[in-house]
């Protein structure tokens, strides 16, 4: 049984989940020659963040595209006690915000190449559906 669980975990594509560790995301992006999509979010208090997740990131077409092309990295800053981050994770998110979101915009989504060059920034909820969001990324891929 343990072998099956390990095999299943190893076979999961890296972009099928939102990572929370920048170093891990960077390593995966380098190894697979993929872009990194960083999303700064307030998952339990930021209305536009919640809306963007529902209308873009939770949609099947976005997930299918991301699975093949992106490493997803979420820097969440929840406020409710029940969603409180570990001290270590909060420190990682704050360090990431200092570099990529110094103004504290929510939501803020960035597309980076495998060498960490910022290719595109979406400040706030851009009001795109998942198909439109994917099309914007595809234009950058060309």
Language-model-derived ranges and their functions:
Residues 60-125, 129-132:
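Thioredoxin-like thiol-disulfide oxidoreductase module
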């Amino acid at each position: 049984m343990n072998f099956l669980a390990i095999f299943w975990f190893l076979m999961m594509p890296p972009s099928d989940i939102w990572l929370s560790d920048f170093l891990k995301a960077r390593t995966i992006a380098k190894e697979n020659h993929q872009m990194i999509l960083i999303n700064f979010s307030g998952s339990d208090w930021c209305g536009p963040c919640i809306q963007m997740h529902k209308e873009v990131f939770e949609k099947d077409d976005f997930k299918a595209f991301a699975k093949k092309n992106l490493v997803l990295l979420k820097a969440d800053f929840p406020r409710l006690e029940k969603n409180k981050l570990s001290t270590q994770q909060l420190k990682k998110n704050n360090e990431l915000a200092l570099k990529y979101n110094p103004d504290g915009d929510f939501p803020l989504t960035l597309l980076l190449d495998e060498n960490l060059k910022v290719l595109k920034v979406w400040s706030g909820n851009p009001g795109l559906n998942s198909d439109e969001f994917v099309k914007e990324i595809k234009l950058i891929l060309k």
